[in-house]
Amino acid sequence: MKNLTDSFVYLGHWPSAGSFGFNTDILATNPINLSVVFGVLIFFGKGVLNDLLDNRKQRILNTIRNSEELREAAIQQLENARARLRKVETEADQFRVNGYSEIEREKLNLINSTYKTLKQLENYKNETILFEQQRTINQVRERVFQQALQGAIGTLNSCLSNELHLRTINANIGMFGTMKEITD
């Protein structure tokens, strides 16, 4: 604290006229010494300060330039992504339309296939019915023929006596015998 008070005391005290030198006490220096010190600092510090400011300015400009490049790249990526999105949306629409048309085509194919299958089943059914009708008709004919034959045999048996029956058999045997002689 004593140095600080001493320096204020020295402000009011001027050195004697015969001495020349630098006063290192900043608070006790005169304006000439201060201007010399500031001049030396400005002269030598100007280059260093300019270099520091130029370096800082270059870094700021580089950062701005890099930021602009990154911004441009981001904008380009965004445009590319939007273009890809539009392309994918277009392809999705095409797939959707193609899918709907494919579904309609498959639906028509299924309807046609089902119609053909039903037609074949109808034909099989008709053929089966016709076959069953023919079989039934044949069975009825066979029964009618058997009943007619049994009726004829019954009528013949009731009308013919044993003697008439033997004569008919002999006559038929005779006819077969003459037929055999003619064919030989």
From Swiss-Prot:
InterPro entries: ATP_synth_b/b'su_bac/chlpt (IPR002146). It is found in: Plastid, Chloroplast thylakoid membrane. It comes from the Eukaryota. Its main location: plastid. The keyword Ligase does not apply. Keywords: ATP synthesis, CF(0), Chloroplast, Hydrogen ion transport, Ion transport, Membrane, Plastid, Thylakoid, Transmembrane, Transmembrane helix, Transport. Pfam families: ATP-synt_B. GO terms for cellular component: chloroplast thylakoid membrane; proton-transporting ATP synthase complex. Belongs to the ATPase B chain family. F-type ATPases have 2 components, F(1) - the catalytic core - and F(0) - the membrane proton channel. F(1) has five subunits: alpha(3), beta(3), gamma(1), delta(1), epsilon(1). F(0) has four main subunits: a(1), b(1), b'(1) and c(10-14). The alpha and beta chains form an alternating ring which encloses part of the gamma chain. F(1) is attached to F(0) by a central stalk formed by the gamma and epsilon chains, while a peripheral stalk is formed by the delta, b and b' chains. F(1)F(0) ATP synthase produces ATP from ADP in the presence of a proton or sodium gradient. F-type ATPases consist of two structural domains, F(1) containing the extramembraneous catalytic core and F(0) containing the membrane proton channel, linked together by a central stalk and a peripheral stalk. During catalysis, ATP synthesis in the catalytic domain of F(1) is coupled via a rotary mechanism of the central stalk subunits to proton translocation. Component of the F(0) channel, it forms part of the peripheral stalk, linking F(1) to F(0). This is ATP synthase subunit b, chloroplastic. It comes from Crucihimalaya wallichii (Rock-cress).
